[in-house]
UniProtKB/Swiss-Prot annotation:
Name of the gene: ydbI
Protein name as it appears in the record: Putative transport protein YdbI
Topology class, membrane: Multi-pass membrane protein
Stored PANTHER family: TRANSMEMBRANE PROTEIN, TRANSPORT PROTEIN YDBI-RELATED
Similarity field: Belongs to the autoinducer-2 exporter (AI-2E) (TC 2.A.86) family.
Organism of this sequence: Bacillus subtilis (strain 168)
Transmembrane segments: 18-38, 67-87, 145-165, 207-227, 229-249, 257-277, 289-309, 311-331
GO CC terms, sorted: plasma membrane
A Gene Ontology biological process term: transmembrane transport
Length: 350
């Protein structure tokens, strides 16, 4: 018995045990995972935005944290309201037109470029059945959009109250250091700091990259006189949240619409545009926004996306890579550059 107690008192075993307990608790609350993830995402992004805005405004005059947070959430509420009344009808109409166009292409596959060559290699492809199945999946998600919308509103409210009372919350949580739950507090604080640093950093980078991809794609499609600009831009933004694979996936519908709009030359143009945007993402945005320890080989990226989508569904495509990077950070799996920088950084701090 003493040996068993000594075994669980080992720091590594204790940390792993608490991690398993935390994972089990999250599994018990899996029905609320949307609210939990949305609250964390909104809190993290708004906290970073508040810091940037306050640093900029402080160059001219002093402003409190609460004033900036209040302004940001009021601005967000105004944007959501205006977007709902002004842009929603336009976007909804364009998405309906986009759906009709995809249906037309599905039931007339001869309009797809190189369709004869594809069928000669892979055999007959019943595209209409795939499209029907895809629309059934989309309809299932749209049927729950009211529930998801309520979760978004609740997550925004929770994130606002969290940011308002961030100092009081940290002071309250610090009381657990001297409580009987000190061991749990120390390990949870360790995982929390790692989670915010890696998971939050990667998510923030994904949102910025998706926004830049969306803007660049919108400009390119506008120059090429594409139809349904807003609908396609929203599609590109959400696909851009999927690391690496999102850019490739967006190429398929864009190429089909490009062919129906301007023929083979437009397909070539859109391929060049997507490759140019992917090059900007790979060689400029990723090195600027992500640290060395978050860079993954393409094979690992796609493997993680496949498994995370299987276990977590649509959320897995967005949070799969951040969770994987978080686990790597816990295990201290870093690049040689990071390890060589670590001692120097620590010595500088001392």
């Amino acid at each position: 018995m003493a040996a068993l107690v000594k075994f669980f008192q080992h720091p590594g075993v204790r940390r792993f045990s608490i991690f398993v307990v935390l994972t089990g608790v999250l599994y018990l609350f899996k029905s609320m995972i949307n609210l939990i993830l949305l609250t964390f995402i909104f809190t993290f992004l708004m906290d970073r935005l508040e810091l940037v805005v306050r640093q900029f405004v402080s160059q001219f005059f002093r402003v409190s944290q609460r004033v900036v947070i209040t302004f940001l959430y009021m601005l967000l509420a105004v944007l959501l309201t205006v977007g709902g009344f002004v842009f929603y009808p336009v976007v909804a109409a364009q998405i309906q037109q986009l759906v009709k166009q995809i249906k037309h292409i599905a039931y007339h596959p001869d309009s797809i470029p190189f369709f004869d060559e594809i069928t000669s290699v892979f055999g007959d492809i019943n595209i209409s059945s795939y499209v029907k199945e895809g629309f059934n999946v989309v309809y299932t998600y749209l049927a729950d959009i009211s529930t998801f919308g309520l979760q978004v509103v609740m997550a925004l409210i929770l994130s606002m109250f969290f940011l308002f009372e961030k100092k009081r919350l940290s002071e309250f949580m610090a009381k657990f250091k001297t409580s009987k739950l000190r061991v749990f507090y120390e390990e949870i604080a360790f995982f929390g700091s790692k989670f915010a640093r890696t998971f939050g950093k990667v998510l923030e980078a994904q949102f910025i990259i998706a926004l830049v991809n969306c803007i660049l794609t919108f400009i390119a499609l506008w120059i090429m006189h594409f139809p349904q600009l807003f609908g396609l831009s929203i599609m590109v933004f959400f696909l851009g949240l999927i690391p690496v694979a999102g850019v490739v996936i967006s190429l398929i519908p864009l190429s089909i619409i490009a062919y129906s709009t301007g023929g083979g030359m437009y397909v070539l143009y859109i391929v060049l545009v997507i490759f140019a945007i992917h090059a900007i993402e790979t060689y400029f945005l990723n090195p600027k926004l992500m640290s060395a320890k978050t860079e993954l080989p393409i094979f690992f990226t796609f493997t993680v996306l496949i498994f995370s989508e299987h276990f977590f569904g649509i959320w897995g495509l967005i949070i799969g890579i951040p969770i994987f990077v978080f686990l790597l950070d816990i295990l201290d799996v870093t690049n040689k550059e990071d390890r060589s920088k670590g001692p120097r950084e620590n010595s500088d701090k001392k």
